[in-house]
Amino acid sequence: NNSYDRYWEGRKAWGQIVISLRNLARTMQVSIPVHNEQEWQQKKRAFQLLIAFPIAVKLHLRQNPDNQELADFLTPAECATLDQVPNRPIYITLWLQDYLQKQMDCQRVDSNRAWELDDSVNQLIQGLATCERIVHTPLPMAYVIYLKQLILVYCIALPLGLKPELGWSMVFIVGMVAFILMGVEELAREIENPFGLDVNDLPLDDLCTTIRRNVTMISQFQPPLFPSTDDR
């Protein structure tokens, strides 16, 4: 149960990250106006930061120092900077927050939208913190050892509780029960850290791809042109 709770909590944390990134992209696209090429390039970079954030979270949780996956969305200078910092996702949010703050200072975003953007960034940090807590707080070793010993004692004592009339079939019954219990214990151990590369871990690569597609789609949105009242 503890392992599954950790797995499900990790999935909810990533769900929070996905929702927050979608909200950020949506609000940025609709609420931050662009008047020239320079402003568009700045906004485009902010969208790239949104795509890079979940990739950085994935690499951070897997303790993978390679920034090659980030190179498609960040400049070489930015990747070099991330090589020097201990927490790449946090640093990406600093770049993102700097862009948003400049939009607020230039009064391109009203106070309500500014609050929404700031809250979404905070939600990203909370999702990251939840994932870090899961990774850095493994199940106590005493709990793991006790569980193994409990299963072993149960399997040894199980034949004493079965009827002697079962004969040799008792061996198959005990073997089947032992197989099931040990399988459950192994599964619990495997999903204890749901952010790895095992087949039963969370599909972080797929989640990152989904976020990239969503942010790209939102960044390409153009509001429809409605006819003016004079043309009707």
Segments from the language model and where they lie:
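Structured inter-helical modules in multipass membrane proteins
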Residues: 27-141
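Juxtamembrane membrane-water interface segments immediately C-terminal to a transmembrane helix
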Residues: 7-18
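Transmembrane alpha-helices and immediately adjacent membrane-cytoplasm interface residues
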Residues: 1-7
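A residue-level signal for conserved active-site and pocket-lining positions in enzyme catalytic cores
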Residues: 17, 57, 191
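Solvent-exposed, non-transmembrane helices and loops of integral membrane proteins
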Residues: 21-51, 195-232
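Short alpha-helical basic/polar micro-motif
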Residues: 2, 15, 129, 189
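Alpha-helical transmembrane anchor segments
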Residues: 133-225
